[in-house]
Amino acid sequence: RRKLEEYLESIRRVERRLAFADRRLEASPKLKRQLRRPGPGIPDSHQDYMRLMLEMIVLAFWADATRISTFMLDHGQSNRYCNFVDGVKGTWHALSHWRDYDGKTEDDDGITSWSSAEEKQRMYNLVTRWHHEQVGWFLERLASIRENGKSLLDQSMIVYGSSLSDGHAHS
């Protein structure tokens, strides 16, 4: 009974987060005009969205609804602005080409520029670290759930990787 209540409360938390994202958007006409959103229920914050998706994977594993899941943190040519990461400006794809720092390459938005390759690489590394932190949060969440004397993490195989070792060189 306790396990079922714990599981159902986790589902309710996800539902509350989805409802909050909708209410926040509706309460701010300015925000509503500025954002082009994929649909209702998706949080404004990319971190909130990512955590919500990871939480749904946790819930699916916990309920034994699936034994396999894939999740792409971001695709390689993402033009998502990463300004939500402290100390970062520009898009993920542009930052991956950190050796080109003048803001005039086909991968840049034509507005953002950086003072050096080192500055741009530092920002790229901050975004990469942010992605790692999201995976760390997911692993901690799996580790926090006990099933049959073991954590859900102990009963899982997690593979985390990237399609490239160097985004600038496409290698």
Regions found by a protein language model. Give the residues of each.
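Ligand-binding pockets and gating/stacking loops
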Residues: 1-171
